[in-house]
Amino acid sequence: MSRPRLTRWHASSAPRSASSEVRILAPLQPKGPAAPIAANAGGQLIYAIGDIHGCYDQLRTLLKRIADDAGADAAERKPSLIFCGDYVDRGPASAQVVEALCWIKRHGPFATYFLKGNHEQVMLDYIADPGPVRSWMRFGGADTLRSYGIAPPDADDPIEAHVMARDDLLERMPVAHLRFLEQLELMIGAGDYAFVHAGVRPGVALADQSPEDLLWIREGFIDEDRKYERIIVHGHSWVNERPTVLPHRIGVDTGVYQTGVLTAARIEDDGVTFLSAR
């Protein structure tokens, strides 16, 4: 069975259209109208997984549900998993999550694609030079260090304390974890969909989006009601435990580290449904 055709975005890839509608699996209901989305997935079955944030138990449960769901699909096609970034920070088990994703990448039965989130970028920045990003400790970095068995310094501690913590992290973190983080993608395209972590800058072609916007954007994207070259599937911004479903974008981050709910969008030519795990 050949690998599904998911690619990095190229501006020359013209989107196609087909009639489909959004369907929501109970008990979740979408934020916003469940308006019809004229889109296809290129004949593929895709699961787009929202921000995990160190919540290993929910990840394990969701992957089991995805495996069961994919196994019930009669079509002769290899499903694809697209992880939408923010694997680390805030939850208690970032190291376990990264280890699980490394295993899935090497041995899993699905085609797998991993997007970079802003939290992975800050973690990599801390590894490169902790001084400018000591504030990482305030928005989840301390939880990630603890998951690797490291006592985190306070954000305001002297730079020497952060250099020591960084060095301890490099000693304890498996090389495979670092390589995994370094190889994350910024955007993946499939059919009429583009998958990113945070969103895109309105008025800028997908091929010309900046890494900063793909990783960090909120204002100017989530409050903008406009069509893009493709339907944007993203994480990063959440309201509650319900996914966001709009004609121009689908938000799969459901704030698992606070709500306890991890969500995946199931995307195929017939439409979009959702799986969730607590």
Regions found by a protein language model. Name each.
Residues 2-278:
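Feature recognizes metal-dependent phosphohydrolase scaffolds
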